[in-house]
């Protein structure tokens, strides 16, 4: 059985070799590409006053002396000391 000839054979008969089909038809190639529409500008959010960061919305202000029991993880001991101290004040 004879071997097949490659498309780009050196001997190649141009009449027998089929040309590759065009990717786009002539009608589509004649039309210019449509211009892209300009992007719309984004709307700026309306300002309703001063906003805090998400993590600080519900927290009370921290005093500057550093006696914040929640931050120092002594909340249970500080609360128990305050409860004992109020009973002795009478």
UniProtKB/Swiss-Prot annotation:
Compositionally biased residues, Basic and acidic residues: 7-23, 37-64
MF terms in GO: chromatin binding; nucleosomal DNA binding
Swiss-Prot/TrEMBL keywords: Acetylation, ADP-ribosylation, DNA-binding, Nucleus, Phosphoprotein
Location in or out of the cell: Nucleus
CC per GO annotation: chromatin; nucleus
Statement: the UniProt record of this protein carries the keyword DNA-binding: yes
Annotated positions of the Phosphoserine modification: 80
Modification ADP-ribosylserine occurs at: 29
Pfam families: HMG14_17
Region (Disordered): 1-90
The organism's place on the tree of life at top rank: Eukaryota
Family indicated by similarity: Belongs to the HMGN family.
Name listed for the protein in its UniProt record: High mobility group nucleosome-binding domain-containing protein 4
Organism (species): Bos taurus
């Amino acid at each position: 059985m004879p071997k097949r000839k490659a498309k780009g054979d050196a001997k190649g008969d141009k009449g027998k070799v089929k040309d590759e089909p065009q990717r786009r038809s002539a009608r589509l190639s004649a039309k210019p590409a449509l211009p892209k529409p300009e992007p719309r500008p984004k709307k700026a959010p309306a300002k309703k006053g001063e906003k805090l960061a998400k993590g600080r919305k519900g927290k009370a202000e921290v005093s500057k002396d550093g006696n914040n029991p929640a931050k120092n993880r002594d909340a249970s001991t500080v609360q128990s000391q305050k409860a004992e101290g109020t009973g002795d004040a009478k």
